[in-house]
Amino acid sequence: MRKLTISIAALASASVFALAAPAMAQDVVPQAAAEEANSDIIVTAQRRQEKVTEVPISITVASQAQLERQQVNNLNDLNRVAPALEIQSAPAQNTGGGGSIRGIGTQSFSPGAVASVGVVVDQVSQGNANISDLFDVSRIEVLKGPQGTLFGLTTSAGVINITTNAPDPTQFSGRVRTELSDQGTAGSKYGQQVIQGVINVPVSTTSALRVSGMANLRQGVNRNATTGDWNDVNRYAVRGRYLWNVTDDLTFNLLGDWSKGSTENGGDFFTFLSNTAANTALLNSCGITPGEGNQNYCLGAANEFSSKFEGWGGSAQLEYDAGPLTLTSITAYRKNETSNTGGNIYRADSLASTLRSGATGTKIRLFTQEFRASSPSNSTFEYTVGAFYSNQKTVQQPERFTISVRLPNGIVIRPVDSLGALNEITDESLAVFGQGTLHATDSLRVILGGRYTGGRLSLDRTDAANGSKSFQILNVDRISWRTGLQYDINRSLMAYATASRGFKGGQIAVPTAPLLPYVVQPEVPMSYEAGMKATLFGGAVLDFSLFYSKIKNFQAQECVVNPVTAQLVCAQTNIDGVKTRGAEINLFGRISDRLSMNTGFIYTKATYPGGFIGNDATNIGGKQLAYSPRYKFTLSGEYEQPLTAGLNGFLAADTIWKSRIRYQNTSRAEETFRAHWTVGGRVGVRSEDERYSAGLFVRNLFNVHEPSLLQSNFGSGIGAIYGPQSFRQVGLQLDAKF
């Protein structure tokens, strides 16, 4: 550890002299440059600017226009963008964003867990202090398969690579856009008001400031039947970016963001789908009718089980063109804080049993420092080498759990009363990496890259009941790598084949006190991919891939309900031998002058190892993994038609089809959701110069109640968590630019 600390100090000292810059060249190249020809969609999947058709990685790209058309306002909405990507929005479970790619992800309530799908914003890894809200975004790239060589620890399944709009020194501009809906109006099952704004101010001929912000106010999707009030779920955020082209060779980029949010009565949390006959009668008495799509709960206490969130972060980025090399330095810091009042987890005052949590809070602080040196893109041997350091500290306050049971004679007993524990988790790592591409011929390229990671994960735990302490350490020392071939069949068709060994750090699981913490081993996938990319219709990109991956020590969470106390108990564990294999095809870009489209289909056979016994003691070996649909289809498209001089009409569609989804490591049918379509769309008009637009939109037209989470034996019944994706929304969209 001493060597690691000395190396960290050396990196920090060197940063004083580092010459580097914006979020790479993408920050200084106007957005129009990436859109002047659809065949030249520019991505940064290999930490340099490249055409998407030249990158030997399966990628789904969503432009700003598509994100706004599909109303992608937060990470959870990214479900609709790529068939390979799933985002689970269950509260406190969406580690590092909660994403899974090709069936592989990390769903965990443990504060010591890290993600399998990394979230990277303007080159900065978000760790577990990730952003939630998406606004003023230029594009999003979904990179599939292990990306650890260039992106680091939390990318064993893939990366969500987000690029926001850069400041523009050439002009003053601004924009305001809104999405407005009201519960009960035009069939909308909840209300939501989204307001986003941006202003771009040139400071000089070589620098500019861009400030953007948003407010996302939602009423529902849950309703307190006792008071008749819909839950308020509100979020606010602002981002500032300052870009300065100091010289022709040196660029400085300073970024900062702040966000704040609150939820009432648990926000989007469990409601009852079914229960025993006796309990159903009790639930009916306070206004709850258990069933699919139930939005009601009943709490008499004001604002019980509510939470608040606040987070901020910033980065300083320098880029210097030193002739044969481009040198980059990125220094970043993030901080997130959440607090929860605690309350009745069942959210049903009428039940004889109550599972109650106490007030608690969590703080996450993340510091990262990265240095890179990159060769010119037109060299025979292109390469990127660098070093990366991260230090993430999580402090989780004790959370009391109590179970109370009201007996028929009126006496209340408390079979469980745990005061919880204070958990302090430090995750520190240092890595060196490099990846190169050798142009063996004009058509053939050879890829080779590797990353060495050394780190230390530690947990200090103090039992709130008796003050006893425990300490756990997990040291890591691993190499991940990537190799492959890439061949240009002709000017518009490229093929590739790669092999990658990924790596995701271990966990120190923190079960409910007085149970002691334990180590969950690092996750190591061995993955193979072959694919082709083609340019069609003069500009659209076709991306086809075949993939296979076997994961050693897949990190999973197994949740069961204690039949005596009815307490939900979740344990983190390793499952060795999980496999995912299949095929995917994506088509995105502009099909014609009037039609743009992003569509894709994936077949993913992601399975438990043979003989694996699930939480219900049944053999589910070879069955589909939890949270992973075997088939998924996505379609987003817009057709534009001139109506009058200066005015165009548009019609957009947004459709998803998923096969049956399993939500727990069991064979219970009640913990799955059927195959289903989710259909949405938009119709409206916009000015020919796109300065103004107005439209009507609908999401989940047929009101299909796909849950975020299903849990059997919840309060002697079945519980579901529903989010905004689970109900119909109808509203008005307005947009103005100046």
Predicted regions and their residues:
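N-terminal Sec signal peptide and the immediately downstream disordered periplasmic leader
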Residues: 1-70, 76-80, 200, 248-249, ...
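Acidic, small-polar-rich N-terminal luminal/periplasmic segments of exported/outer-membrane proteins
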Residues: 36-169, 530
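Outer-membrane beta-barrel translocator/receptor signature
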Residues: 114-116, 135-138, 144-224, 229-238, ...
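Membrane-embedded beta-barrel scaffold of Gram-negative outer-membrane proteins
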Residues: 196, 315-344, 488, 492-502, ...
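Structural signature of Gram-negative outer-membrane beta-barrels, strongest in the C-terminal barrel
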Residues: 243-247, 373-376, 388-390, 423-551, ...
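Surface-exposed extracellular loop regions of Gram-negative outer-membrane beta-barrel proteins
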Residues: 262-273, 393-395, 456, 486-529, ...
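Gram-negative outer-membrane beta-barrel transporters
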Residues: 383-384, 442, 446, 548-550, ...
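C-terminal beta-signal and adjacent terminal beta-strands/loops
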Residues: 552, 597, 656-664, 685-738
